[in-house]
Curated annotation (Swiss-Prot):
Gene3D superfamilies: 3.30.420.40. Its EC number is 2.7.1.33. This is Type III pantothenate kinase. GO terms for cellular component: cytoplasm. It catalyses: (R)-pantothenate + ATP = (R)-4'-phosphopantothenate + ADP + H(+). Pathway: Cofactor biosynthesis; coenzyme A biosynthesis; CoA from (R)-pantothenate: step 1/5. GO terms for molecular function: ATP binding; metal ion binding; pantothenate kinase activity. A monovalent cation. Ammonium or potassium. One of its GO terms (biological process) is coenzyme A biosynthetic process. The keyword Metal-binding applies. K(+) binds at residue 129. It comes from the Bacteria. It comes from Bifidobacterium longum subsp. infantis (strain ATCC 15697 / DSM 20088 / JCM 1222 / NCTC 11817 / S12).
């Protein structure tokens, strides 16, 4: 069994894969203060919840955009599973060509998302990831990543809103019942949701304006689910996209 780990700024997402089948996935809060033992205990518990043990894990692949966490997490894998993880980055074959000014600056999570989208749904494809940051990456029909787009994630924007104002409360990030809000909380929810949704749709429109060939839009990320019922500009929602990409990358690097 392959264990795939996405270490993001807000969450660490762990998936267990039997071939192409995802047999379990778990999400925990990213904390730089967690020790390797704490991460190891969490991994052990997640394995047990999926009716597995450490002996069932044959290999581990990791995407990380948080270097401070990577050190202790890697140590937990070595101590509790006896495995040195494959880390998506320089020296690892991804199967994707990257035509950016500086390919090294493209996050490993974005690369895995693009690999998952291209090798699952084909190209050309615009890959949207709604996480701590919102990213769009365009992959052409040959599997080449040709552009990147980065902006604030909806939760990051929301935290700035209530964190930088004296009287606005923290609210749940969710789809409101109506844009016609009647109190402060629902007004904030409507404002955040529809402003962000409008930004998503306008961004996709601009990509379509500047790209000569038709393409599909594949969305992923923890908050993509709240937009799926309110726009027809996204073709596919795939919460497991990064796991699919990591599994593909792993397959290209093992004999």
């Amino acid at each position: 069994m392959l264990m795939a780990v996405d270490i993001g700024n807000t969450n660490i997402v762990i998936g267990f894969l039997e071939g192409d089948r995802i047999v379990g996935s778990y999400r925990i809060t990213t904390k730089a203060t967690h020790t390797s033992d704490e991460y190891g205990l969490m991994i052990t518990q997640f394995l047990a919840l999926s009716d597995y043990t450490a002996d069932d894990v044959d290999d581990v692949i990791v995407c990380s955009v948080v270097p401070k966490v990577m050190y202790s997490f890697r140590a937990s894998l070595i101590k509790f599973l006896g495995l040195e993880p494959m880390v998506v980055g320089p020296g690892v074959k991804t199967g994707m060509n990257i035509r950016l000014d500086d390919p090294k600056t493209l996050g490993s999570d974005c690369i895995a998302d693009c690999a998952g989208a291209y090798h699952t749904y084909g190209g050309p494809v615009l890959v949207a990831d709604f996480g701590t940051a919102t990213t769009f990456n365009y992959v052409d029909s040959s599997g080449t990543i040709r552009s990147g787009f980065i902006t604030t994630g909806i939760r990051t924007g929301a935290e700035a809103l209530w964190g930088q104002t004296a009287q606005l409360p923290e609210v749940e990030i969710t789809q409101p019942q109506s844009i016609l809000a009647t109190n402060t909380r629902t007004a904030m929810q409507a404002g955040l949701y529809y402003t962000f949704l409008g930004g998503i749709e306008r961004t996709i429109q601009q990509f379509r304006k500047e790209i000569d060939e038709p393409f599909q839009v594949v969305a992923t990320g923890g908050l993509s689910r709240i937009f799926k019922n309110n726009t027809d500009m996204i073709d596919v929602y795939d919460s497991d996209l990064i796991f699919k990409g990591m599994a593909y990358i792993y397959s290209r690097n093992v004999k």
